[in-house]
């Protein structure tokens, strides 16, 4: 099991990034909550990792801190929640907001995440509440001050939202509603998700 990787970011395009470690490039899938903390390409970063091995693929997931990774591991243990949905949850609502929803049994907010129906939301609360009540974190992602290395932040943001399960029309409508094309892709995604999932 690979516990963490320290290396240089070669490229990043949510939800994927390429990390070079000792001359080897690792393709890593990460939630948007992690992307909010990433430096620019060619800078060094430490990512906590979780490797999932299947017959057709070995997928390496990366996280900004151990709290995010523990939450991801708790999510994939829930009946009906696989890695893709777990990633969508962390991307769509953020680790701290998810914990808040679970502890307060806010089913209505959870079902606004793409791929999460009412039954899944109820299982998330039932199966993770006790564990999450024992966890505490002060790590709150913030998109402020982050820059995108891509020259097409709007298109990148729309593509990232589609990768999370939103329809093309929904993604474009959410990005267009922000009306700030000069923002980075990460910030556009964050604001769009806040609008679609949290309703603010």
UniProtKB/Swiss-Prot annotation:
Do the record's keywords include S-adenosyl-L-methionine? no
- Annotated region described as Flexible linker, given as residue ranges: 144-148
**Record's keyword annotation contains Lipoprotein:** no
The transmembrane residues are none
Q: Name one GO cellular component term.
A: Holliday junction helicase complex
> Which terms in the Gene Ontology molecular function aspect does this entry carry?
ATP binding; four-way junction DNA binding; four-way junction helicase activity
Task: Please name the GO terms of the biological process aspect recorded for this protein, alphabetically.
Answer: DNA recombination; DNA repair
Which domain of life does the protein's organism represent? Bacteria
Question: Which portions of the sequence form the region Domain I?
Answer: 1-64
Family matches, as InterPro entries? DNA_helicase_Holl-junc_RuvA_I, Hlx-hairpin-Hlx_DNA-bd_motif, NA-bd_OB-fold, RuvA, RuvA_2-like, RuvA_C, RuvA_C_sf
> Where located?
Cytoplasm
Keywords of this protein's UniProt record, alphabetized? Cytoplasm, DNA damage, DNA recombination, DNA repair, DNA-binding
S-S bridge residues: none
Give the start-end ranges of region Domain II: 65-143
Which SMART domains does the annotation name?
HhH1
Span list, region Domain III:
149-200
Q: State whether it acts alone or in a complex, and with which partners, per the record.
A: Homotetramer. Forms an RuvA(8)-RuvB(12)-Holliday junction (HJ) complex. HJ DNA is sandwiched between 2 RuvA tetramers; dsDNA enters through RuvA and exits via RuvB. An RuvB hexamer assembles on each DNA strand where it exits the tetramer. Each RuvB hexamer is contacted by two RuvA subunits (via domain III) on 2 adjacent RuvB subunits; this complex drives branch migration. In the full resolvosome a probable DNA-RuvA(4)-RuvB(12)-RuvC(2) complex forms which resolves the HJ.
Comment on protein domains: Has three domains with a flexible linker between the domains II and III and assumes an 'L' shape. Domain III is highly mobile and contacts RuvB.
Described function: The RuvA-RuvB-RuvC complex processes Holliday junction (HJ) DNA during genetic recombination and DNA repair, while the RuvA-RuvB complex plays an important role in the rescue of blocked DNA replication forks via replication fork reversal (RFR). RuvA specifically binds to HJ cruciform DNA, conferring on it an open structure. The RuvB hexamer acts as an ATP-dependent pump, pulling dsDNA into and through the RuvAB complex. HJ branch migration allows RuvC to scan DNA until it finds its consensus sequence, where it cleaves and resolves the cruciform DNA.
Q: Please report which protein family the annotation says this sequence is part of.
A: Belongs to the RuvA family.
Q: What is the name of this protein?
A: Holliday junction branch migration complex subunit RuvA
Q: Which organism is it from?
A: Coxiella burnetii (strain CbuG_Q212) (Coxiella burnetii (strain Q212))
């Amino acid at each position: 099991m690979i516990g963490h990787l320290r290396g240089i970011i070669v490229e990043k395009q949510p939800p994927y990034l390429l990390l070079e470690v000792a001359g080897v490039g690792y393709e890593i899938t990460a939630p948007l909550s992690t992307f909010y903390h990433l430096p620019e390409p060619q800078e060094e970063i430490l990512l906590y990792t979780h490797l999932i091995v299947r017959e057709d693929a070995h997928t390496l997931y990366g996280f900004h801190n151990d709290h995010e990774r523990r939450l991801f591991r708790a999510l994939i243990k829930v009946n009906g929640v696989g890695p893709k949905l777990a990633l969508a949850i962390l991307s769509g609502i953020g680790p701290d907001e998810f914990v808040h929803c679970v502890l307060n049994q806010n089913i209505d907010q959870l079902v606004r995440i793409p791929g999460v129906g009412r039954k899944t939301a109820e299982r998330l609360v039932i199966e993770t509440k006790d564990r999450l009540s024992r966890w505490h974190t002060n790590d709150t992602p913030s998109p402020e001050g982050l820059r995108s290395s891509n020259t097409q932040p709007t298109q990148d943001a729309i593509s990232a939202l589609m990768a999370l399960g939103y329809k093309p029309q929904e993604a474009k409508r959410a990005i267009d509603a922000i009306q700030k094309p000069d923002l980075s892709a990460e910030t556009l995604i964050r604001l769009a998700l806040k609008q679609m999932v949290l309703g603010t």
